[in-house]
From Swiss-Prot:
The keyword Protease does not apply. The gene is nadD. Belongs to the NadD family. Pathway: Cofactor biosynthesis; NAD(+) biosynthesis; deamido-NAD(+) from nicotinate D-ribonucleotide: step 1/1. NCBIfam families: cyt_tran_rel, nicotinate (nicotinamide) nucleotide adenylyltransferase, PRK00071.1-3. This is Probable nicotinate-nucleotide adenylyltransferase. Its EC number is 2.7.7.18. One of its GO terms (biological process) is NAD biosynthetic process. HAMAP family: NaMN_adenylyltr (MF_00244).
Amino acid sequence: MEVNVKRIGILGGTFDPIHNGHLIMAEIIRGAFELDRVLFIPSGNPPHKKNQTVTDAEHRYNMVCEALKGNPYFEKSRIEVDREGYTYTIDTLGILNEQYRGIADLYYIIGADVLYDLLTWKDYEKVFGICKFIAALRPGTGKEGFRERIKYLEDRFSASILEAEIPLIEISSTMIRNRVKEGKSIKYLVPETVENYIKKEGLYLK
């Protein structure tokens, strides 16, 4: 009996907060690569931000829940939020690989800049063996260097990296946090449900 293998995109991040840039990128990539769904995974205790203040994981997870309402192709996961200690991508992918083995192929969505950090990830060679990557290239980013990096990682480590071009969206979580702190509007930068949650919980005021 032939099994219809699904294609699942994975978008991990601190999401502090999640914003419309994340959602637009995910939707464009979902359509371009015919992904059956995109799984949003808020980080629990990210090791690369251990010297930074990160909003409580429950708040960040709740904002992701609010942001994904209304899109049947977007799902959220508590897999990292519920894990104690630092959360590493290899551990998350190991669990997802077991869960979806033979059922779905995993596509990990990253920004082009992350291509240059992949070799600092814990057990990165195992990561390359578990999933394919979709690297999002924004306008104005050096395409030649981007493709050279992809070729190097594929040739040297047998990584599988697909290229996605997305529009330039000048929104960042840092910008949103700063605007809230300064009493400025964040309307149209985040979904209205996320804006309301931030106001209700009094986030980013300090």
